[in-house]
From Swiss-Prot:
Sequence segments annotated as region (Disordered): 116-161
Keyword Secreted: no
Location(s), subcellular: Nucleus
InterPro entries (UniProt xref): bHLH_dom, DNA-bd_prot-inh, HLH_DNA-bd_sf
Broad class of the protein's primary localization: nucleus
Protein name per its UniProtKB record: DNA-binding protein inhibitor ID-4
Length: 161
C-alpha cells in the first residue's frame, strides 16, 4: 500500500510548521516507497531528501526576493524626491525613480558646460568601399569589470550573494 497525501495547489505554500509530513508522504508516494514495518528507515531518509530538495528549490526565489528588496531600499535612499520619513510602497517608488532619471537627463542635456563645447569634427569622407583603420575597441568584458566594487559603501552589497 502506498501513502498518498493531498497535493497542495502549485503556487501556494503550507503555513510555516505545516506540510513537512505531507511533503514526506507525498515524496514517498511519488518514489514508490511503501510504509511497511521495515520501511521506517527508508521513510526517514526519503523525508530528509525531500525536505532538502524543497529547501534548495526555495533558495533561488528567496535570494531573488532578498535582492529585489535590497534594490528598492537603495532606490529609496538614493532618490531625493522620495519622502524619507514616510512609508512608500514599491509601486510608488518607481514613478519617483523615473522622474528623477528624466530630471537628471534634462540637466545633462542643458548643462552650460556641455552647450559651449564645439561639436566634434566630422569624420573625413572616404571613397566607397574603403574604410580607414579604426582604433582597436576595448572589449566589453574589460569595461564591465565590477565598477560597483569601488563605489559601493559598506552595507550596500546585495544581501543574498
Amino acid at each position: 500500500m502506498k501513502a498518498v497525501s493531498p497535493v497542495r495547489p502549485s503556487g501556494r505554500k503550507a503555513p510555516s510548521g505545516c506540510g513537512g509530513g505531507e511533503l514526506a508522504l507525498r515524496c514517498l508516494a511519488e518514489h514508490g516507497h511503501s510504509l511497511g514495518g521495515s520501511a521506517a528507515a527508508a521513510a526517514a531518509a526519503a523525508a530528509a531528501r525531500c525536505k532538502a530538495a524543497e529547501a534548495a528549490a526555495d533558495e533561488p526565489a528567496l535570494c531573488l526576493q532578498c535582492d529585489m528588496n535590497d534594490c528598492y531600499s537603495r532606490l529609496r535612499r538614493l532618490v531625493p524626491t522620495i519622502p524619507p520619513n514616510k512609508k512608500v510602497s514599491k509601486v510608488e517608488i518607481l514613478p519617483h525613480v523615473i522622474d528623477y532619471i528624466l530630471d537628471l537627463q534634462l540637466a545633462l542635456e542643458t548643462h552650460p558646460a556641455l552647450l559651449r563645447q564645439p561639436p566634434p569634427p566630422a569624420p573625413p569622407h572616404h571613397p566607397a568601399g574603403t574604410c580607414p583603420a579604426a582604433p582597436p575597441r576595448t572589449p566589453l568584458t574589460a569595461l564591465n569589470t565590477d565598477p560597483a566594487g569601488a563605489v559601493n559603501k559598506q552595507g550596500d552589497s546585495i544581501l543574498c550573494r
